[in-house]
Amino acid sequence: MEQLVSRLEAVTNRLEAVASRGGGSTIKAAVDDDPAWFDDFKVFNAKFLSGFVNDTIALGGELEQMGKFVNEAFHCHLVLMEVAARHNRPSQTDLEGLLKPLSEAISKVQDFREKNRSSKQFNHLSAISEGLPFLGWVGVAPKPVLYIQQMEESAQFYTNKLLKEFRESDPKQANWATSFIQLLKGFAAYVKDHHQAGLMWNKEKSAATPAALAVSAHKPPVPPPPSGFAPPPPPPIQAPTVTHAVTGSHSSEDSRSQLFAQLSKGSEVTAGLKKVTDDMKTHKNPELRNQPPLKSSALDPRPYTPPNLKKFSAPVSKPAKKPALFQLQNKKWVIENQDGNTNLEISECNDKQTVYMYKCHASKVHINGKVNSIILDSCEKCVIEFTDVISTFEFTNCKACKVQIDGFAPTISIEKTDGAQVFINPKCLESQIVTAKSSEMNICVMKPDGDLTEYPLPEQFKTVWNPATSKFITTTMDLNL
């Protein structure tokens, strides 16, 4: 079996060499004017991408379904490359439409991984989920190779786990992990050779539109049932066509028959090649070295720099700003989403009501009377002034906020806040102040003569072991030192 596989691979390589030179070969592409970069991609796609799908499905379990999702993503990528080879660069709106099917196919892979976190093959699924977005290079410029390498590094985190786990116990799993990384490296080399500044388009053709996908798209080939690792398939002898179907002697059945006829010849497949004489060799014919280099294809335009698409998916619009709210709901004063409003006042209140201020910015609230409690949550640069509270005044998740207490508050709580200025009168010195995960906290005591005395609250603490009590003792660091 191994000898047969080796023989098929050798014949495949010879066929590829014949097809790439185009001389003396009976196999001819259905579309003659495809750029050279697309011909190279079709060979890579057939030999490596399709082979990886088959190897993935062969592992069974959740990878069987994952392989089908990967096959769908590779198919969308192939169709998009075909459109680029036969159309000019589209507008930004049309480009997003062309990228949408590929983006959705990649999302299916990532969603499937998230739904199977308890799977024994989670590292396999994660490697694919982290690495497969490399197909999004088609929307990245001007450095798509760097993008592919980043996806490779993300996938390698999980493939290294697989190698560590299965290198000795199950070489089949380890070989799969290695082959995936080699696939990513190989594709990065292909992009570096042909699309270094971004996806190439055919400048001599009309601009592409999403309708080109419908013309070009066909149902992805169904991968064969898993039966172990299969040898790489031979390169396609007929390029997929966008504008018309191939009929007559170029039909798929005839092409398949031609391929098997070539394979059956064995080593005689290269008998029809022309012999390379000394006058055709560069190192033996000085005149050839003096000639300017030939272009790979007349339809292979120079690289250009498309608009920078930092993200593969379409930009997401910012969430709409929520409306401001200031009203009494049952026994709760609700103040939300106020921005720059410094004239908020609660004049009619009682000791059974509470005040809740949420996500306000640069606003000020004055409370005339006694309430049960006051909470400032996720506010920034806000000021609140009140007379008395029965239970607690609280800062939570705030930034650079101030409070002035004209009367008394039994408890002042400051939690997850950066920047809190608390102005109190001498009657409030008996209040209990509780802080947690906060910084830049100051208590300012207002004297009868109008002066202020500022006391910073500690942010650093020191913990030491007390052998006498067999306990840890925590003390504050003196901020006045």
From Swiss-Prot:
- Looking at the keywords, is Manganese present? no
**Location(s), subcellular:** Cell membrane
Composition-biased stretches, type Basic and acidic residues, lie in 276-287
Region of interest (Disordered), ranges: 216-257, 276-315
Tell me the membrane topology, using the record's own terms: Peripheral membrane protein
* Chain intervals with Pro residues compositional bias: 220-238
Cross-referenced SUPFAM superfamilies:
C-terminal domain of adenylylcyclase associated protein (SSF69340), N-terminal domain of adenylylcyclase associated protein, CAP (SSF101278)
Which molecular function GO terms apply here? actin binding; adenylate cyclase binding
Is the keyword Membrane assigned to this protein?
yes
The similarity comment for this entry is: Belongs to the CAP family.
Q: What does this protein do?
A: May have a regulatory bifunctional role.
Q: What is this protein called?
A: Adenylyl cyclase-associated protein
**What's the encoding gene here?**
CAP
